[in-house]
């Protein structure tokens, strides 16, 4: 339960990471004010999902920046957690945050590719596009919210196991809301096929991680 001591080496990457995240938020707010205003109220109403989920069948810069922000936020959360528990051997000390960021981006991009591949196998392209849009919206919102809490914790010297548990809870709860939104949006269609719908969700959400873990094991065993 001891708080982290804010050594210079610890803050070397934390400050630029916060600066980048808040800079991306400012960019979205300045260049997409209507978009951003609707996104801010994501947990209050589903206006953002209802309007932009249909409009943005193709990649939109707002969604791309959100996704990038999510990657940086998650990397920062992992970085702080690893520093707190003294985990240093997996990455070089000097470039630990950069390596984590690249790893998170690679994993999430691979996950997207695998989800698209799984959706094409089951002929679920339309559903998968809606699914991915909602998941990105909520998971990015969760990551940004967790980083805002982390910002207060880091610069108040309050980073502890309790705070890390709170951050994990924020990620878990808001991501769970995305599943509620997906089910609500497809309730009429899934009622007669609830079992198959659960299988589809498992295929889209769990299958990518199975492939990633299997691939990682192959790489490790061949080294």
Please provide the spans of the model-predicted regions.
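Juxtamembrane boundary at the C-terminal end of a transmembrane helix
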Residues: 209-223
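Hydrophobic alpha-helical transmembrane segments and adjacent short intramembrane/lumenal linkers
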Residues: 128-210
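Hydrophobic alpha-helical membrane-embedded segments
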Residues: 6-38, 110
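Hydrophobic, aromatic-rich alpha-helical transmembrane segments
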Residues: 7, 11, 15, 19, ...
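Selected alpha-helical membrane-embedding segments in polytopic membrane proteins
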Residues: 32-123
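Alpha-helical transmembrane segments and their membrane-interface exit regions
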Residues: 24-25, 44-49, 171-179
């Amino acid at each position: 339960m001891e708080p982290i001591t804010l050594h210079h080496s610890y803050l070397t990457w934390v400050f630029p990471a916060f600066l980048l995240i808040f800079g991306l938020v400012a960019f979205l707010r300045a260049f997409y004010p209507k978009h951003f205003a609707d996104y801010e109220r994501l947990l209050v109403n589903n206006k953002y999902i209802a309007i932009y989920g249909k409009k943005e069948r193709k990649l939109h810069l707002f969604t791309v920046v959100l996704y990038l922000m999510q990657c940086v936020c998650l990397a920062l959360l992992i970085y702080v957690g690893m520093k707190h528990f003294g985990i240093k051997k997996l990455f070089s000390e000097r470039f630990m945050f950069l390596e984590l960021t690249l790893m998170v981006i690679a994993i999430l991009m691979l996950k997207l590719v695998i989800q698209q591949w799984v959706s094409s196998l089951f002929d679920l392209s339309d559903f998968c596009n809606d699914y991915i849009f909602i998941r990105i919206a909520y998971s990015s919102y969760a990551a940004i919210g967790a980083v805002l809490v982390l910002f207060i914790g880091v610069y108040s010297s309050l980073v502890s196991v309790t705070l890390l548990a709170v951050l994990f809870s924020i990620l878990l709860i808001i991501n769970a809301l995305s599943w509620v939104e997906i089910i609500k949006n497809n309730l009429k269609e899934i009622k007669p096929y609830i079992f198959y719908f659960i299988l589809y969700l498992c295929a889209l959400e769990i299958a990518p991680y199975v492939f990633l873990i299997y691939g990682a094991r192959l790489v490790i065993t061949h080294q």
